[in-house]
Each structure stands twice: as structure tokens, then as C-alpha cells.
């Protein structure tokens, strides 16, 4: 079942934590 988890990554410019990826188990 694919679980949608949130991940934090910092872009080249300073910004908030954004980003998503699907993790399969």
C-alpha cells in the first residue's frame, strides 16, 4: 500500500519545508 509521507528539503533559496514522496511497502 502506497503511503504518502511528507519530507523536508531546502531549495537553493531559503524557504519553508515542502515536498512529498510516495513510499511503497
From Swiss-Prot:
It is found in: Secreted. Its main location: secreted. Residues 7-25 form the BPTI/Kunitz inhibitor domain. GO terms for cellular component: extracellular region. The record marks 18-19 as: Reactive bond. Signal peptide: none annotated. One of its GO terms (molecular function) is serine-type endopeptidase inhibitor activity. Keywords: Protease inhibitor, Secreted, Serine protease inhibitor. Inhibits trypsin, human plasma kallikrein and human neutrophil elastase. This is Kunitz-type serine protease inhibitor 4. It comes from Rhipicephalus microplus.
Amino acid at each position: 500500500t502506497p503511503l504518502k509521507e511528507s519530507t523536508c528539503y531546502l531549495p537553493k533559496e531559503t524557504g519553508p519545508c515542502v515536498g512529498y514522496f510516495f513510499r511503497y511497502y
